[in-house]
Amino acid sequence: MSEEKERLISGKLAADDAKLDTSLRPRCLSDFIGQKRLKDNLGVAIQAAKQRGEALDHVLLYGPPGLGKTTLSHIIALEMGVNIRITSGPAIERQGDLAAILTNLKPFDILFIDEIHRLSRNVEEVLYPAMEDYALDIMVGKGPGARSLRLKLPHFTLIGATTRYAMLSAPLRDRFGSIFRLDFYDEDAIHDIVSRSAHILGVEAEENGIRQIACRSRGTPRVANRLLRRVRDYAQVKGNGLITGDMAAESLACLEVDRLGLDEIDHKVLKTIIHKFGGGPVGLETIAAAISEEADTIMDVYEPYLLQLGFLERTPRGRQATRLAYQHLNIPYPADKNNQQGLWAENGT
């Protein structure tokens, strides 16, 4: 669906985000805002590895897009004082592609694989001995005379990032020494991120203006920085460049981002469930067909925040809009919905 490419409040990396993300990226754990428990545990692991003079144990980062998985990987490399090699699951098509990357790593280097859940099983199998034994097994020859040759690899750290933790195979998950989930940020943390970014970009913003952006950022730093940039442009053209509360609210209203950070596509998902399917429950594939979207995109991009807000429920029968969703959209909640939910509960569904 082409709309997703232009979606302002998507956590996915857009083409014009890369340069901005790099300029705003913190360079050490102490500058990384939010995710306190993750930071504390990761900081201990980094310090311990440095004190022992070892490579950091393999790290898996998972959670919705835009929460800082790539940023954390760069911070880990900087904190460890090592090089980082960046690639992605879809970019590694064959075993030979991964073998070429692994054999070019230097001692203690970091290999960052984004979307690691998209590695094929054949390629994934190359990682098992590489992660566990720092070795690469290659087949020499063909047919009955083929034999396995083991090449030693330098000790390195694999950092995997994924939005689909459940899609990782158990053997791959088990080989990560540290597994961290990144959660949506609370409004105070997003406020601090917007404030920091505004300072770096030289943008003048009042406290209420920062709050207006933060509350619409879906708990996602990438979205917060993107909205800040759009509001900055609006304030420059329509005002004197100062982001006030009214200026931010006016700008975001023009961009069709409501007070909770929902856009027209979020509204479309919820209204489709409510109006076309009686509020649900309805299957994911059915919703996808109704709004001309891929089921995976709905599950990865739209659902996490709607679930976080309590606007959507996943039930054994499918997706269901909650009373909160009706209230937010100013749609009367049907009286018979409570009775239906009671019957489902009695039936154990």
Swiss-Prot record:
Cellular component, GO annotation: cytoplasm; Holliday junction resolvase complex
Region (Small ATPAse domain (RuvB-S)): 186-256
Molecular-function GO terms, alphabetical: ATP binding; ATP hydrolysis activity; four-way junction DNA binding; four-way junction helicase activity
EC numbers on record: 3.6.4.-
Binding site for Mg(2+): T70
Similarity comment: Belongs to the RuvB family.
NCBIfam families attached to this UniProt entry: PRK00080.1 (NF000868), ruvB (TIGR00635)
Protein name listed in UniProt: Holliday junction branch migration complex subunit RuvB
Lineage: Bacteria, Bacillati, Chloroflexota, Dehalococcoidia, Dehalococcoidales
Name of encoding gene: ruvB
